[in-house]
Amino acid sequence: MRVVVTGGTGFIGSHTVAALVRHGHEVRVLARRPEMVARVLAPLGVRAEAAAGDVTDPDSVAAAFEGYDAVIHTAAQIGVSGGRGRCDDVNVGGTKTVLTQAVRLHLDPIVYTSTISIYLPSQLPVVTPESVLAEPLSPYAASKLEAELLVREFQAEGHPVTSIAVGGVYGPDSPHLDSSFAGVLGALRSMMLVPPGGTTVVDVRDTAELLARAATPGRGPRRYLAGGRYVTWSEWVQLLGMAAGTEMARQDVTADEMIALGREFDDQRKQGIEVDIPLTEEAAIIMTRCPPTDDSATLSEFDLDYRTTAETFGDTVE
């Protein structure tokens, strides 16, 4: 198949391009900076055509889709603070543009990369694809929720949109040290605050392989979870320390203490005070209210098994 990937110079997107190429697909990357495509893909040992454009621009999106069969939409604006601005433009407007143009040009499938944050924070013992969506705690979360509702509208209309909600993504060869890596770097450089609860860890290579396997036409609208392996925060620290070959400094805290500290850091940032620890009140709430995800249907349908967290962390810090 001929597949367009948005966000192909990002972490998930670049690995998805590599997985698609390994599966024998012809890949085009829609990028605002097309000169970055070859540079980002080089460490992964693959090449792809680059098309200049922005997911918020209908004309460049339509031009990139011409002559192609399917699209995997991984482009997103990540952030948990500040005004909605670019988050709305990319996460909502960009998603609407991609879906609209893909439907108009009869692409099949249209694969959308969602996030389990749409379900968080949650008091449920386990999150499933049918779990209730959470009330957003930040402009970023609000934009992802709005995008998710938009995707579900397209699915309800019968369009061949496959959505896959992924968890905390880690692994090797990240073009940009952001997102999950902020927590890793902060924990390794200073100290890890360890609250009750846990988190999901999914390897970027497993995520990419799943997205590549989802690029199958004729399946109609589908929704999947790919949160990954669940670990407690205590296990997270232990596994990361083993991967780094060091005993990590840690301090156990209660959920209330963690949330209060996140709120204090938010207040300091508003006052222009630089805070080295990548913790916000929203992040603290989610850290203490993130249940496991039931990915069994996803793994069974796509005949996939997740790498161990030890392997993922080992390759992350390498």
Predicted regions and their residues:
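NAD(P)H-binding glycine-rich loop region in Rossmannoid oxidoreductase-like domains
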Residues: L44, A48-G93, Q101
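Conserved beta-loop-beta element that borders a ligand/cofactor-binding pocket
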Residues: L149-P172
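N-terminal Rossmann NAD(P)H-binding glycine-rich loop of SDR-like oxidoreductase domains
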Residues: V3-H25
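Mid/C-terminal beta-alpha module of Rossmann-like enzyme folds, strongest
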Residues: L210-I277, D295, S300, R307-V317
